[in-house]
């Protein structure tokens, strides 16, 4: 239950570091990324609802790594563009959660469950 309460508390906080969830969702949709609400939930989980140091300093919304190091961007919108590039040739439709699991998007074995929880509890 601690995980659930932590995630809910995280979701109730307000983004103050250059982007709101609405702005991120708009940018995800603008790029035509499939399943935008799942992708937004990923960003919220990866960044602690846009409050993490990686988000604030490096503008990395998705925990994306290049050559084993977390990517740094000059603006958070570049992170959305990079996310699309990372998945565009790999996602061929179907269950997006299964896709994320198949490609090993995150090392946390509970990652998909956490993303689903965010989608469900925040009416995404």
Model-derived features with residue positions:
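Catalytic cores of secreted/periplasmic lytic hydrolases that degrade extracellular macromolecules
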Residues: 2-6, 11-124
């Amino acid at each position: 239950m601690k995980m659930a309460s932590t995630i809910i508390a995280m979701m109730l906080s307000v983004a103050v570091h250059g982007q709101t969830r609405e702005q991120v969702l708009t940018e995800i949709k603008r790029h035509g990324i499939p399943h935008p609400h799942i992708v937004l939930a990923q960003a919220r989980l990866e960044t602690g609802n846009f409050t993490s140091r990686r988000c604030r300093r490096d503008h990395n919304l998705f925990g994306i790594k290049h050559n084993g190091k977390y990517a740094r961007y000059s603006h958070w919108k570049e992170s959305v563009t990079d996310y699309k590039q990372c998945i565009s040739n790999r996602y061929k439709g179907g269950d997006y959660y299964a896709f994320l699991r198949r490609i090993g998007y995150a090392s946390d074995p509970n990652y998909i469950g956490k993303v689903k929880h965010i989608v469900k509890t925040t009416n995404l």
